[in-house]
């Protein structure tokens, strides 16, 4: 017989706050990310956007810049009442444990994302069976969108107003415009 989840509701006890994390690099945060965060609020009482500090990646924005861009984007969209932003290093599932989260939120753009997300969900379940992974399908208008694509658009001087918030667009332009000219692709 399986043991009940340590987060399970027990008769006579008030229900515990349901905390979810939405992990990622968010380099930069896009309208697709923010759409997933907004929709994830239907599944939890509090959402923590968990910005990974992965030393193996070379992000365009520093960890502090990414945290600030997310906070400012949430404020611009009036989404910050039940969403917090935090950074972490190490296993996502361990961070979820530390903050009492019972859900890990992931976004799926296409079937090509599914295999990787499925493997991550199984590894996370093996590490802690009390934490579930929930995948949300990306809204149709953002199904093509990725942070890599946004960085490339910015580097090439493309329109950013429909893919990121104004604060992120401004930060991207500041990173890529050098002396009035767009940065060279080798600068990335």
Give residue ranges: language-model regions.
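Nucleotidyltransferase catalytic core that binds NTPs
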Residues: 2-188
């Amino acid at each position: 017989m399986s043991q009940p989840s340590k987060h399970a509701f027990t008769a006579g006890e008030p229900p515990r706050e349901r905390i979810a994390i939405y992990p990622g690099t968010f380099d930069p945060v896009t309208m697709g990310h923010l759409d997933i965060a907004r929709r994830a609020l239907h599944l939890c009482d509090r959402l923590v956007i968990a910005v990974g500090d992965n030393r193996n990646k070379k992000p365009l924005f520093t960890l502090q810049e990414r945290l600030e861009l997310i906070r400012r984007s949430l404020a611009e969209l009036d989404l910050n009442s039940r969403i917090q932003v935090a950074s972490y290093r190490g296993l996502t599932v361990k961070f979820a444990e530390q903050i009492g989260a019972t859900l890990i939120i992931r976004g799926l753009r296409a079937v090509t994302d599914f295999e990787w997300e499925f493997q991550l969900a199984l590894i996370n379940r093996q590490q802690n069976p009390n934490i579930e992974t929930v995948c949300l399908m990306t809204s149709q208008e953002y199904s093509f969108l990725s942070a890599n694509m946004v960085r490339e658009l910015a580097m090439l001087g493309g329109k950013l107003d429909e893919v990121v918030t104004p604060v992120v667009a401004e930060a991207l332009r500041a990173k890529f415009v050098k002396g009035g000219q767009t940065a060279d692709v080798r600068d990335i």
